[in-house]
Design a protein with these regions (language model features):
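C-terminal transmembrane helix and the adjacent membrane-cytosol boundary/short C-terminal tail
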Residues: 169-172, 218, 222-228, 267-304
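Transmembrane alpha-helical segments of polytopic membrane transport and secretion proteins
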Residues: 1-48, 287-304
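Generic hydrophobic transmembrane alpha-helix motif, especially the helices
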Residues: 81, 85, 115-116, 125-191, ...
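Glycine-rich helix-loop "coupling/hinge" segments at transmembrane-helix boundaries
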Residues: 143, 154-157, 169, 183-185, ...
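Transmembrane alpha-helices
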Residues: 100-116, 145, 151, 205-237, ...
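Hydrophobic alpha-helical transmembrane segments of membrane transport/permease proteins
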Residues: 2, 7, 11, 15, ...
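Transmembrane alpha-helix signature in integral membrane proteins
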Residues: 91-126, 279
C-alpha cells in the first residue's frame, strides 16, 4: 500500500510539475518562402513590367510603332531611347507593342499544349492498352525531332503566318505534358484512394476527373510555367526565320531579324533581343519558384 501511495505520489507530483512548469518546447524555425527569394522577386517584377506594357501599350509607347517619319538607323538618344530601325520607326514603341504579341500568344499556346497533353497523357496512363500505345508512339515521333526543326516543317507546309506558328509550337509542345502526366497517373492509379473509389463503382472518367486531377495540378502548373519561356523563344525563333509574324507587325523575333541585316546599327536587334532574354529568364524564375513552393522536399531543403 505504501509502495502504491509512493508511486502515485511521484506520478502526481510529476504531473503537477509538468503542469506548472512545462518543459521548454523546441522553437520551430520559420521557413523561408520560395516567393521571397531574389530570383522569384526578379521574375515577378519583370513579368509585371511586361504585363503593364502589354495592357497599356497604346498609352505608354512614345510613338506609333508603324510610323515611318524619322531618319533610319538613328542611334539611341533622348528623343528615341532605343533608336530607330531601317524604316525610321521608333524601336522603343515597337518593343512595347511587341509584348501584345509575344506574351498573349505564348500563354495561349502553352494552355493549348497543356490541355491536349494532360488529357491524352491521363487517358493513356489510366486506361492503357492500345490507347496508351497510340498516344505514346505519337509523342515519341514528335519528340524524335528537334522542336524548332519540326515547327519549321509544319509552318512551311501550312504557310508562314502567326496562326500557323502557334499551331506548330502546340504540336511540338504537347508530348512533354503527355509523358509527365502519364507517368504520374501510372503511379497514382495504384493508390489506395483510387482503388477504394473503384470498388465503390466509380468509372474511370470519374476517377480521372475527381481523384487524380487534383494530384496532377501541381506538376502540370510547374511544367506550364517553365514552358512559357520556351514558347516565347520558339515563337520568336520562327518569326526570326520569317515563318511567324510578318511585316510590319511589331514582333520581337521579326525585329531581331531586321537588325541582323546591319550590324553597325546594333540597337535594332539588341533591344528586342533583350526583351526576349528577359521574358524567358523571368518565366524560368517563375517556374523554378513554383516548383519549390509545390514540392515539399524542395521546400524543406530551402528551410534548412
Amino acid at each position: 500500500m505504501n509502495a502504491t501511495r509512493l508511486f502515485l505520489g511521484d506520478r502526481l507530483g510529476a504531473d503537477r510539475t509538468g503542469t506548472d512548469d512545462p518543459a521548454p518546447r523546441r522553437k520551430r524555425r520559420p521557413g523561408k518562402s520560395p516567393w521571397r527569394s531574389p530570383l522569384a522577386i526578379t521574375g515577378l517584377v519583370i513579368i509585371g513590367v511586361f504585363l503593364i506594357a502589354a495592357i497599356f501599350a497604346s498609352l505608354i509607347s512614345p510613338e506609333d510603332p508603324l510610323a515611318q517619319k524619322w531618319p533610319k538607323y538613328q542611334s539611341p538618344s533622348g528623343e528615341h531611347w532605343f533608336g530607330t530601325d531601317q524604316l525610321g520607326r521608333d524601336i522603343l514603341s515597337r518593343v512595347i507593342h511587341g509584348t501584345r504579341i509575344s506574351l498573349p500568344l505564348a500563354l495561349l499556346l502553352v494552355v493549348l499544349a497543356m490541355v491536349i497533353g494532360t488529357v491524352l497523357g491521363a487517358v493513356a496512363g489510366y486506361f492503357g492498352g492500345w490507347i496508351d500505345m497510340i498516344v505514346m508512339r505519337c509523342a515519341d515521333l514528335v519528340l524524335a525531332f528537334p522542336a524548332i526543326i519540326l515547327a519549321m516543317a509544319v509552318v512551311a507546309a501550312l504557310g508562314p503566318n502567326l496562326t500557323n506558328a502557334v499551331l506548330a509550337v502546340v504540336i511540338v509542345s504537347w508530348p512533354t505534358y503527355a509523358r509527365v502526366v502519364r507517368g504520374l497517373v501510372l503511379t497514382l492509379r495504384q493508390s489506395d484512394f483510387v482503388q477504394a473509389d473503384r470498388l465503390l463503382g466509380a468509372s474511370g472518367w470519374r476517377v480521372l476527373a475527381v481523384d487524380l486531377r487534383p494530384n496532377l495540378a501541381g506538376p502540370v502548373a510547374v511544367l506550364a510555367a517553365l514552358d512559357l519561356g520556351n514558347a516565347v523563344l520558339l515563337l520568336s525563333g520562327l518569326s526570326f526565320l520569317g515563318l511567324g509574324a510578318q511585316p510590319p507587325a511589331a514582333e520581337w523575333g521579326a525585329m531581331v531579324n531586321a537588325g541582323s541585316a546591319n550590324f553597325d546599327a546594333w540597337w535594332v536587334a539588341v533591344f528586342p533581343g533583350a526583351a526576349i532574354l528577359l521574358s524567358v529568364l523571368a518565366f524560368n524564375f517563375l517556374g523554378d519558384t513554383l516548383r519549390d513552393a509545390l514540392d515539399p522536399r524542395t521546400a524543406r531543403a530551402i528551410r534548412k
